[in-house]
Amino acid sequence: MKNGKYVILCIDDDKDVIDSLRVILESNNYIMVEAFSAEEGLKKYTASNPDFVIVDLMMESVDAGRAFVKELQILNNKAPIYMLSSVGDSLASNIDFSELGLTGVFQKPLDINTLLSTLKIKLK
């Protein structure tokens, strides 16, 4: 938390997704920290100490999102981590999300109400 607002780290290589998340989050009184790759996401994670993490499953490499989450486990992450996944993403259907260390999954296109209600519940 920073200045009384929750910090949300969003990692996705799609600028349109990042821009959409920024509009939604900032208009609902959250601070958004962005990253466009898993590597950049790790740097932003350690610098910002986020309260909640949203990471795309498929980024610059097929399992960049998974590798990022594993790195957070090594860092003893306590923030809820939600993976972004495309509807019908065959890789997503083959992953045990809880075993990977994820709190949950958001399907693309992202439903604003689902995002905001999840944040409200998980950040109590």
Predicted feature locations:
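Hydrophobic/aromatic residues positioned on beta-strands within the core alpha/beta folds
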Residues: 84-86
